[in-house]
């Protein structure tokens, strides 16, 4: 009888421990990435996981032979190359407010995770800094960059935080959250409210409130690439993501304040989409690019009550070209051969080729 009771208590203890582990795993799974949880309050959050991107592309494999001298010196002194050694990055975007005689300035706070030598990086930052401020056992490097102040802190092995906001409170808060081991549900309120809607497996995503027209510097490409940002309702929320499956699935949910607002945005997006599909897409090598064409042909827009959803399926080959070749060129679709008009006989010159640069 005593043996049975002992086994019963063992079984209960195992069940409790297993339940705790499962709960912790589920909480961790539904929580945003560690780097995001360190970020301060902001108007937009952008996250990218570069590790899987390197598997699908040549990023970091064919490093450029010629680079900016200042960046080359950074690499020489630190041994860190962003293309090769940066694994994950999270950005908080602060739009700023315009004041009398002063334009609104966008500021950024970021957390970078990768492989770097803390001693070498620390020595490099110390050379650039005008002073080093201690805070809770961490060194904050104060670095002047143009007319702003950049604060950088090395938080631990392979992780750094930086911010160019006016107040030091931002970087202090990032350090404090790191010291608390980045609890699962801390971080920007935008992320707490909307991260659950980011598709599982997304390696690039953003959650943002679009800026008011003329309220801050242009930074819309972090929200929805390709020029769509100018259409976004300023009182809405955008959740955009990219995740790799058979191809890269792109999705952007635009949440508006009303069905009428969603309908208006969809109508604008439909016009914009029709324009995109009328363009001819080519690489510098000349001729239509089928991967680019397939990506834009897959673009779809549909409305769900107060929301508008934009989706696209992009071939992996497209991203390989983007990261290894010259930029994609956009231009009006070339007229069919039967519709082309011959140049006047008296001109004495050949008709220009619209694909030539």
Label the predicted regions.
Residues 35-39, 46-50, 55-57:
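N-terminal, charge-rich interaction modules
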Residues 53-89, 132-246, 262, 275-282, ...:
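An internal, short helix-loop-strand segment that often contains or flanks glycine-aspartate motifs
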Residues 1-16:
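N-terminal Sec-pathway targeting helices
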Residues 46, 82-186, 252-255, 302, ...:
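Single conserved position on a long alpha-helix in the C-terminal lobe of the eukaryotic protein kinase
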Residues 27-28, 50-52, 254-357:
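C-terminal functional regions that serve as terminal interaction/effector modules
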Residues 25-43:
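Ser/Thr/Pro/Gly-rich low-complexity linker/stalk segments immediately outside membranes or between
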Residues 55-57, 117-123, 259-266:
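Short, conserved charged micro-motifs
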